[in-house]
Amino acid sequence: MAWLVKTEPGEYSFDDLVRDRRTVWDGVSNPQALKNLRSMSAGERVFVYHTGDERRVVGRAEVVRAGGAGKDVAVELKAVDRLVRPVPLADLKADRAFAESPLLRQGRLSVVPLSEAQERAIEARARNAA
């Protein structure tokens, strides 16, 4: 399974994760996002998405430690690598794989599950120039 997590780069960017190597991903309050965070398992792939003015997928991470149950759910992520070509939100909106995705339908959802097709679409767009 793969996931996409959103972050405001002015608060904590993918560069910060690369610098820190690992971080505890917490501060999630939306009930659906918390449910998604609880569903993450160690070893799963994670794409990091910058919100705000950037609005693009910028890097890859991996779940190191799952979040467990309870109210204060958090997972530990480690940086994997930066995408060669960041993938803008406009590219995702144009891809049919994302037509029903919570990423587009629930814009404020900060932790989003990705289907295999969506993961492949991000990887393909990250490799190919526009």
Predicted segment positions?
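Short, acidic Gly/Pro/Ser/Thr-rich loop/turn segments
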Residues: 10-12, 84-85, 119-121
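Hydrophobic/aromatic beta-strand segments within beta-rich folds
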Residues: 43-47, 111
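Hydrophobic beta-strand signal
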Residues: 47-48, 62
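Aromatic- and Lys/Arg-enriched surface recognition patch
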Residues: 58-112, 116-117
